[in-house]
Amino acid sequence: MSEPWRDSNNVVKAWKRCLGFFVQRRPPGFCERVPSGALTKPLAFNWSFGALLSAFAACQNIPSLRDEMAEDLPFLRKVHESYFDSRHQAFRSTPLRWKGDIYFDDNAWIALAALDIFRMSGQNLWIDDAMKIYRFILKEGYDPGSGGVYWRMHPKSSLHVCSAGPTALLGAKLMQLGESVPQDPIDKMIEWCWQMRDSRGVFRDHYNLITRRIDSSVYTYNTGTPLHAVMVMAEILPKEAYDNMAQDVLASAPALLPGHSLPATPWFNAVLLRALEKASRRYSQEMLSPLLDPYRRDMSQSWKRFESTDQPLVLPSSERKPGILLRDAASSVETLALLHQIAS
């Protein structure tokens, strides 16, 4: 099996091709899908743009690529600002020239990417954005009674692991950086997520406040962020409980990979891999290999296709519409960068 992730030059090559494939200079932004369909807005939803920011951060985290990656940051910043709604101090789902909604989960993903960019660039405007988003979610999206976080601003009809998990992780990372954030909401969000685990130990999707039922759908990213959050908390407050929670989730995580294969959801899988990269610095390879091997296998196959075409790197995706989604391509680049970090 080839191991393209071992060479950092492959990582930057994949990043540059992804960037060039989706970029739009006027107005500045990135396409949601290439080629665009008749009913597709030309510019990406912030979910997909957030995936691109996360891919940038993962690539920039590789020391040998830092200077070269920095060349792309000013343009990314310009696009980033086009989603910002100053009235709410949060990011809308589309650039402000179009009517868009505010989703709490998408804001948390953008804030997490912003924090990672801050760590590498030292530019305070990125951590300032992360703090604005965290305060906004605690004020408008966090339910202190349950510890859950709503999915979207309107209607507030469901509490989602995909909102509570990344928000808990965001709070933990801000605390780790020395920001003044209270611990209680972080712990409550983690506890709420833990109530959403099924009998196998993986995390179910959301609780519907209208029907009072739990949606039992399982996605890899919903296990990734609670796992990541407790590992960060274990570094801040070395309590045995946090470490035990992390190891318990890792022991349950193979249930996400039926037949030892990843689901065809590249972005969801990249979120889980962020947590596994963190775990690779804490726990044994013996524990993690069954989880990491499917990523390596899929990447090896996808890299062969990448090298034989002029298309972006794209891992197996269940997307059935024509063209390539930005978030699928961006998360494939992020996966390559994370595998490089794990191997280093």
Predicted region positions:
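Oxyanion-binding "anion nests"
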Residues: 218-256
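CBM-like carbohydrate-recognition segments
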Residues: 3-105, 159, 241-248, 252-344
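Inter-helical turn/loop segments and adjacent helix faces that build the functional surface
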Residues: 62-63, 120-124, 174-184, 233-240, ...
